Structure formats: structure tokens, C-alpha cells
Amino acid sequence: MGDMSNSDFYAKNQRNEGNHAAAFGCSLMELRSLMELRGTEAVVKLQEDYGGVEGLCKRLKTSPTEGLAGAQTDLDKRKEIFGKNLIPPKKPKTFLQLVWEALQDVTLIILEIAALISLGLSFYHPPGETGGESCGAAAGGVEDEGEADAGWIEGAAILLSVVCVVLVTAFNDWSKEKQFRGLQSRIEQEQKFQVVRGSQVIQLPVADILVGDIAQIKYGDLLPSDGVLIQGNDLKIDESSLTGESDHVKKSADKDPMLLSGTHVMEGSGRMVVTAVGVNSQTGIIFTLLGAGVEEEEKKEKKGGAVEDGHQNTGKMQDGNMESNQIKVKKQDGAAAMEMQPLKSAEGGEADEKERKKVSAPKKEKSVLQGKLTKLAVQIGKAGLLMSAITVIILVLYFAIDNFVMQKRPWMPECTPIYIQYFVKFFIIGVTVLVVAVPEGLPLAVTISLAYSVKKMMKDNNLVRHLDACETMGNATAICSDKTGTLTTNRMTAVQLYVGDVRYKEIPDPGVLPPKSLDLLVNAISINSAYTTKILPPDKEGGLPKQVGNKTECGLLGLVLELKRDYQPIRNQIPEEKLYKVYTFNSVRKSMSTVIKLPDGSFRMYSKGASEIVLKKCSHILNEVGEPRVFRPRDKDEMVKKVIEPMACDGLRTICVAYRDFSSNPEPNWDDENNILNDLTAICVVGIEDPVRPEVPNAIQKCQRAGITVRMVTGANINTARAIAIKCGIIHPGEDFLCIDGKEFNRRIRNEKGEVEQERIDKVWPKLRVLARSSPTDKHTLVKGIIDSTMADQRQVVAVTGDGTNDGPALKKADVGFAMGIAGTDVAKEASDIILTDDNFSSIVKAVMWGRNVYDSISKFLQFQLTVNVVAVIVAFTGACITQDSPLKAVQMLWVNLIMDTFASLALATEPPTESLLKRKPYGRNKPLISSTMTKNILGHGVYQLIIIFTLLFVGEQIFDIDSGRNAPLHSPPSEHYTIIFNTFVMMQLFNEINARKIHGERNVFDGIFRNPIFCSIVFGTFAVQIVIVQFGGKPFSCQPLDLEKWMWCVFLGLGELVWGQVIATIPNSRLRFLRRAGQLTQKDELPEEDVNEENEEIDHAERELRRGQIL
């Protein structure tokens, strides 16, 4: 079917192509086949068939410099002929599919089978009239008042309850899936790209990019479509996502101009004409093939032939952009195997979430909470299974011994159905114990809490891409933050200048500067900066000018404007195409250089970069009249002391601008960087200010109070970094903390062979607060070192911020990676877990608050559920063993299970966070999930509930003067006695739900209760349904209506929970040291073996990425 739809699609397009042959000089299929070529072959084809890239632009009716005119009719025609830049998403699961998935629950299946057997047997009547008598006690009262006719009710009621549970689960999954789709589209809307339309450079949503658009590409971009390079500067692309080639591919208009969607720009910049979008791009073609294969695969899976690699297209490459899925081609046993790698947050709810985990590149280990919950759920599940098995065995043995040993009855064939009915009843009791014991509400509580938090976190400028990151953030013990843009405003202004042997503490009047130096300075800045960087007039009068592009370059262009010059005429005179050679900025060079050809045929190269790095390469400097003089090492040292250090101590970034002339005979070897980028002449040093964000010092103080260490990891000079760290409050004067640069850091952590040693890192990181002049490698090493450290009791949970392409490995290695939404590159965003849409550090503090709130919500739910579990299991078990019947019937247990699991998780998982969450230390990895206070609450309330229920069970009939419900025969009518027990049990749970809102021993359990309307409505709603069940539930719910007095007693005993809660709060925890702490993760048993292997793979993966990035 997929093939058919594809062929229809192409046939339709071919018809379109025929109709529009005159409209454009090339068809869709021609462009598709052109994009399949590479290297020289592509250049030749382009030249011969199209007359080069200019000829291609003519055919596509676009201008290489001005782009598309932007007329709506033209844009619509392009959409119609060449398609839109989006790939249709996978259809969401229907409600029925979700119902079917919910039905797969093992305990529910067991219950369904038991209920069906019960139903079947209730309609079976043994032949002959004597059966009842001769079967003796076993059949006692079976036929009383025709009650046997109603024997089907219990089976039917269980089935009905199962239907309720399934529908509620399916509805939850459906709403969750809908929410994830909303999150997905939000992430996609964030994705924009720079294109030229009508001579204007505009940011366009990726979905609106069309064939013929001229796209501007720069370092860090994720290409949104296929295209042909028009002009490029030192352009290197990582094509591993499509071709599996791990080395970066050099692209140039004359050697290899083909650019493919979904590949990363690792270095350089350029312009390309878009030739294929959406399903017609190289990535889109693969997606379409995979999408067409999904249905076949699903059919195969149904037949049991599950496809080995799980290639289903689980995400969508909406807007033709590869952020949501990356196609990895792995060489496996010599064969290239395709692997779909969805990289955005799960788009299709839980099932897709699982699929995503299965298929994506080995992600970090399970989040802290997931690890603890899995362990706890397994422990509880095992205990529940054991209890239910023991219950069934005891019931069967009790029955067998009583009938066949004590009363010496023979086994009579006609009695077999009656005996089987008893055994089925025992089995149902056992399953009921299991249903109540197994905490299947745990994953639901986690999901609800995370989904609720993620939605609210968007308002706090946190766009969560991986759900578990939200909760992991609550455990964070360390944050390694960038400086620029995160702690500072990222609005660069040149405030000091050193030129012609004079340091100006304010930008001087241009008249006082040597004219030669001024001309060189203005030309060097105007030409040697990205032409996409501009300063535009302010949006509103009196506002600040708008900075577009690289902010450091904006600061330098601002200096040109302050010196009463303009950079645009110079750029117009030397357009980007005329730049002879560009050495783009990267983390190894730490400088950018541009070569131009002068009118006399010679060459001039302008350079700019970190002052200490560029000055080392200078052999001359311009003097007071603008003439070069020799610049000796002695002069350099003096300049560092008198100019650079004082500027850096004021918190300024220092940028040195320099130049060098080359003769054209012979032409230099431009690839010999070491010789080219040397022997420079310094023009000036500029001090650029990037002020600290006003809200940052307070945010850092909150982190420190919350037990989180904030470290600054920056590429800036050590003095600049220290000055900013003091302003932010990361360090305070006189404190014994380390501020070191990358060089010193590497000296301290590496042995004689140059290998990193964990023991050496352990001596550095605890005191380290500022790491300056650091490379992405240093950042990754630091993060890895802190995470792998075992010196503290608790393993550190590290959050990292990053914006550059090279921050990818560190972001992946961190427990939580934050990418910058504004300044961040697409590569960084893709490697991250959370995107900060405002690039602001204080948003990270909000993420910590939400993370802790998730942890607390889950703990509240656990405290509540475990109390119910403990009590219900003990009651069912003891009751069954003593009275041969469970005081709480299967249907009642299912209702309690529904209260416990679905409603309580909704009520307790949606509590809003408060500032008080930041007043305590992180929980840490090895702290038990259930604290001693929680254990005290669980056991305390459990004891209260058990005393009440057993009192009611054994002496209840005397207290209320009613018939006893104990030892009632099979199918006997519901008793008032057992109804009171059931009703009191539910009332105690309802009031205990209010107690469960507090888990740290607080006395006021009502504090802030009305701020959570969901909680209030669920408590009142459950109460109302309980009234209906007791008064009108009748036989299906095994309930007898109660009068007002008995109701008041039930509510009174429930209210006792609140009073008892105050009693428990008074008991000091120190008395309860004997309590075992459940759900604890120790260093050794932190993860199952397969996860440990996955973690190792992850490290290798990150390190491989890092090695690949080292040429940067």
C-alpha cells in the first residue's frame, strides 16, 4: 500500500511537471536526481546541464543575491510544483488502539479470565437434585432464596470494573499523547532559518522554506532542506547522519557544492539555493520509504515477525528538519543498517516513548527517580505476588482439609462444579490481593506529574525535550554554566580601546586617533566579520539599536559606528563573493581571519580574536602615527600587564584586531595556517562589556541555598571570568575557591602521559568555581569527571548549559543538558534535554523548582499508595485466611485501586511548586525514595487503619448490633457488616489523601489546598461516587445501603486519620532508626546490567563525537 501511495504521488507530480514545464526551467524529478550526485560528478552535471549554479538559479527564477521576490502567487506555485518543506507525521494512535494497549496489562488479563470462569460456572447447574445436600458444607446455602441465580453478578461486576479501569487508562494515554503532540509542534515552531527574500535577510519558519529560496548557512546550523552552494567560506559539514561518514566534508562551489537536509554545519558559513524540500529532499526520501514501510512492518509484527531494528518512523521530520528524527546509518557487520533516531520529546505517548528509548542513540542511564521507582515497584510486585500466592494456597488447603479430611467427605463428580466455583472464588481473592499490591499507578503518577510540569515549565521559559530531565533537575547538585548570554545579557558594547600606544577608558573622538590606524581598524572590523552580522535601528524611538548575528561582532560594529564611520559601504565595495579566503572562528583557532585581494594584485589579511592569542602571533604593532613598529616579547608582557589585565579585571572581554600584507608573487599557500596566521601587525585592542543580567545574582544565591554548586565554564580570559563570577556571586572575595584556566586545569588532571586521571580530577572539582579559557573538550572532561567521581557519599547530578556546536558531547554527557534557545546552535539544541527559550540562568532555577516538585509529588503519591497497599493486602490476606473470604470484595478492591491509582495520582501529582522547595538540599542519588518520615507515616497510618478494620471485622456486628458477614456461604446477599468495613476503609483513604499532601513532617496538611482545584474536585468527586456505590451499588458492589448513623460513624472513623496524623507527626524520627528505607539506590546496584552497558556505550559515543569535534 505504501508503494502504491508513493507511485500515485510521483505520477501526480509528473502530471504537474508536464503542466508547469514552462513555469520553471527544471522539473521536480530533475532536481531530485541532481541532488543524488556528489563531488566532481555533481559539479560537471551542474555545469553541463544547467550552466553552473547561476544557471540553476535562473531556471528556478531566483536571484543568488536577492532571493525570491516573495510574491504570494509565486510562492503558492512553488509549493504546488516542488512541495512544502514538511513530512506528514505518523498518524496518532486511535482511542481503540489505546484501549487495546491498556487491555494488555497482565493483572487485568488474569482478572478477566477469572471473571469469565466465574460467569461460566454460575450458569452451570449440576444434574440431579441431591447435589447440594451431598456436597455438604461446601454447598451450604448455595441455593438460599434463589441466590444462585445472582451468581453471575460478581463475574459481570469484575468485567465491568476492568472496562472502567481500561477506559480511564486509555483516556489518560490519549490526553498524554495529545499533549506530547502539542509539545512537538511547539519545538517545531521554534525552528527558524535565515533566508534572503526580496533582498532582505529574514528568519523564516523551516516549514515555509521553498525551492528557489536563498538560505544563509552558518556554523552550528542544521540544514532544513537540500541545496546547492552558491558561495561558501571554509565550509565543513558533518554528513554522518545521512552517509555514516564520520569525517567532516569540505564544501565549496567548485569542488563539492551539494548540501543535504539534516546535516550539520560544523564550520564556516555560506549561501545556498534550495533545490529540494520535504519528502523530496534526500532525508525526506528516506523518511517516505520508511513511512511506507511502517504499515508492512506492523502487519509483520502482528504475525510475530517483528522487524529486527525497529525502523518505524516514530517521530516526524516535520518542516523537513532533522531535529525530530535523525537517520543514522551504522555499519553493522559490513552492511549498512538504517536506524531511526527520534531526537525530540516523545511524540506519541508512552508506547512511542518506549520505542524512542529503544531506537535512539544510547541515552544516559535511567533518571534517578525512574531507577528508584523501578526498584521499588519490583520489590512491591514480588511481595504482592508472594502474598497472593500464599492467600490462594491457604484458602485451597483450608477448604480441602475442612471438607475432605475433617469431615471425611468423598469427592463426588456431581459436586465438581461447586468445588470449582469455590476455587475460582479463591483465585479471584488472590488476584484481587495482587491487583491491590502491584503499584501500576506509579508510572501513571510519574507521567501525569511530568506532563503537568512540562506544560507549566513552558511558561517559565523551559522547553523540555526529554521528559525525565525535568525530574532529574530536582536532584541536581552542580550546574556548569556558560558565561555569555546565560549569566550576562549577551548585549556587547565596546567601552574601552587601546590604539596607537594609548589606552582610552572611553571610546575616543575619531579625530584624536591616527588616520591610518582608524582606516585599518574600520576596514578590518567591517570586512572580517560575518556579513550576516548587522546593527539595525531600534524598533521604537529612544530604544537600543538591534543587534543581529554574532554579538561580539555586533559590539565591534558598534565601535565602528561610534567612531562616526559606517561598515555597510565597505561591505558593498567588497561583497562576500570577493573575499579571497576566510578562516572562520572555531574553538581551536579562537580567531577569525579574512583575506582580500588588493587592487595592485597583492593580498591583505585581517584578523581578530582573543587578545592574548592574537597578540602572540603579532610581530609588529601600529604606533602613535599609525606606522608599524617592532613588537618584542618584552612589549607583549608589558601590554598584558598594563592593558589586557586591567580591562579583564573590569569584567571586559578583550579582542585584538590585526592585519598582515602578502605579496602575490609567489602566492602564499593558504592551507599552511601556521605560517599564514603569524607575523601579524596589531592595530588595536578593544574592551567589550557584556553586563551581568540583573536577576542572576539572586538566582545563584537561591541555587547555593538549595545545595547546588554553580560553576562558570567559559572561553573568556581568566580575569574577565573572575570579575564576572564575583559580580554574579559565584565566588566571594576571600573564599578558598579555585579559578583556573584550561591550561592549568589540564596540567592538574593529566598524568605524565597526558591521560586524564579520576583521582586528579577529584582533587580539583570540589573547589573549582571558574574554569576560564576552556575548550569544549575541557568542558566535557570536567562534566564527566564530576559525574564519575565516587569521592562523595552521593554521586553528583550535573546540569550543563551550552550553545555551541562543540558543546554537544558535554550536553549529552551531563545528567541534564540545557541549550540556549536564542543563541544556541541547532546542534546544541539537538544534544540537549531542555531548551532555555530566554537563555536566562534564572530559568534554570525554575527548572530545579519544578524538578523537586515532581519528586515530591511522586513521594506524596507513594506515601498514600503504600499505606493503602499495606492495609488492603493485610486485610484481604488475614481476612481470607481466618474467615475464608476477603472482607473487601474483588469489585470493591478494583474501585479502591481506581481511587488509589488514577485519581490519587492525578490529585497528588498536580500540586504547584513553592519557593520553600529551594530551601533544602537535593535528595541525591542514593537517598532512599521513601524517607524515614514517609516510612513513619505509612506504618503509622497503616496501624490505625488495620486496628479499625479488624475491630469492625471481628466485633463490628456487636458494636452496631447487626448480622455478622463472616463465614457467609457462596453467593449470599451483601451484608451490612462488610459494607461498613468497605465504607470505613474508603473514608480513611480519602482523609489520608489530605495527610499525604505533606511528606516532610509538616503539621498543617491543609496549607495551600485550595491552590490545587484538581485535588479538591477529586476528593469531593470520590466522596460522591462512594455514596452512590454504597447506597445503590447493591449486589455488583456487594453493598447494603447504610442509614445516616452508620454513615456518620464511617466518616468519623475516616476523620480520625487527620487527628492520628498529628499524633504521628509528634513522634521523633530518631526513635525509628530501625525502619528499613525502601527504594534505595546504592552505588553498586544502581542499574541493571544492560543499562550499565548502555551507559558505557554512551560514554564511547560522546567521546567519539568529541574526537570528531577536535579539529574545531
From Swiss-Prot:
Single Gene Ontology BP annotation: regulation of cytosolic calcium ion concentration
Function: This magnesium-dependent enzyme catalyzes the hydrolysis of ATP coupled with the transport of calcium out of the cell.
Binding, Mg(2+): 803, 807
Chain residue ranges for the region called Disordered: 298-363, 1086-1112
Pfam families the record matches: Cation_ATPase, Cation_ATPase_C, Cation_ATPase_N, E1-E2_ATPase, Hydrolase
Cytoplasmic side: 1-94, 174-373, 445-858, 910-929, 993-1011, 1066-1112
Catalytic reaction(s) noted: Ca(2+)(in) + ATP + H2O = Ca(2+)(out) + ADP + phosphate + H(+)
Ranges of biased composition (kind: Acidic residues): 1087-1098
The EC number(s) this enzyme carries: 7.2.2.10
Name this polypeptide is given: Plasma membrane calcium-transporting ATPase 2
InterPro entries xref list: ATPase_P-typ_cation-transptr_C (IPR006068), ATPase_P-typ_cation-transptr_N (IPR004014), ATPase_P-typ_cyto_dom_N (IPR023299), ATPase_P-typ_P_site (IPR018303), ATPase_P-typ_TM_dom_sf (IPR023298), ATPase_P-typ_transduc_dom_A_sf (IPR008250), HAD-like_sf (IPR036412), HAD_sf (IPR023214)
Calmodulin-binding subdomain A: region residues: 1106-1112
Topology in membrane: Multi-pass membrane protein
Annotated source species: Oreochromis mossambicus
Molecular function GO labels: ATP binding; ATP hydrolysis activity; calmodulin binding; metal ion binding; P-type calcium transporter activity; PDZ domain binding
